[in-house]
Amino acid sequence: MSDTQEKKQFVEDLTDQADDFSRWYLEVVRKAQLADYTPVRGSMVIRPYGYGIWEHMQRLLDRRIKATGHENAYFPLLIPESLLQLEADHVEGFAPECAWVTEGGREKLEERYAIRPTSEAIIGHLYSRWIESYRDLPVLLNQWCNVMRWEKVTRPFLRTSEFLWQEGHTAHASEPEAREEVLRMLEVYREFIETELAIPIFAGKKSDAERFAGADETYTVEALMRDGKALQGGTSHHLGQHFAKVFDITYQDEAGKRQYVWQTSWGATTRLIGAIVMVHGDDQGLRLPPNVAPVQAVVVPIWRKDEDRAVVRGFVDRVAQEIGAVVRLKIDDRDQYSPGWKYNEYEMRGVPLRLEVGPKDVASQAVMTVRRDTRAKESVPLAALATRVPALLAEIQASLFQQAEEFRSQNTTLAGSKAEVIAHFEADRRGFVAAPWDGSASFEAEVKEKTGATLRCVPFDLSRFGSLERPGHRVALFARSY
């Protein structure tokens, strides 16, 4: 089979986005070897390539978390039911999703343990022991862990019973300080997702109906997928003093009086990997942002005659010497696959840059580069690789963000009334709809009941929504979502 035939067959095996986006997504997750199903209900295995993406995301986000003064810790996976029940709104919000441990070995436990759905309860209990004085504040902790939420309908990365995340939990002496923390960490998420994942974000406040169980306020970063649905990329919660009063988290202030602390929590999960797939992917598979790609550039040696093998292989070694220290590089010299097959494998897996090296390239002392985002080709001299390849990766990162931003702009509609919002979604149109919102629960409930769309957030940045501002109203973004 020729390279062209192999490419055609490989591409034909992948469903087009326009035909069935959901099926396309599942096929890409499988073909790109990001994840696979397991015998455990609702739980996936994240394969090495998918976990490699998560490792780079974790490294880049963890750096930002620590730069804002936070430290990492680890709290128990199991949470006593009695602790969860102390905060009524919290337990009511998570009870349908809790998985319970009822036996230890062959003995029935006296008290059930919830497998961690989130950690506010156990952390609140421990903070009540650790915090004594205003000198102990603020407490700024983060943990990287897995959580379990017993989902009825699951989809790899987007909604699974078990997933990986980070959750930050902080305690402060004053409400303004806690509020500052909430907004600071929301900005960390926005900047991280836009800079490293190349995904444009709407940041804003959730409505009361959509806020986290037990929180005073919830803030969110929202992204738009290629099928026109929104995805929540991370949340930051102002917990007020609810958990402090429930778990008796107090401190002695400078005047010697006991005061309740003010708390926050914030988190982001592996569903961001799903967002990368759905924002940047195309009909050939993944298109990974270079900043989080496990392999940023792949070298494909090309030879047809045995006598060319050693020459090409020797030149490939020189390429690795030039750029191996500045990019995450892979050399694919497998004999059992043709160059055409390899091209399509790495297109499917979203490797940002392909470097082709054949006898003609060796003769000209250059490498042919092929971008995954645009398929543009460029011959780069060996001596220039160490500067040009990182520059190309930066261009690809910026290009992916620009394409995603243009798509979001084209699929963000302004509506002047609730009726226009409903009409938009009833016509099966996609994307975000911005509209004046009177702040009532009935407004968003009617939109949700009639269309399935929810109020995603009240955005901070109104630069593109100025025409919608009304006295007594706030601009709100509506969308169908994951």
What are these regions (language model features)?
Residues 1-482:
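NTP/phosphate- and nucleic-acid-binding module
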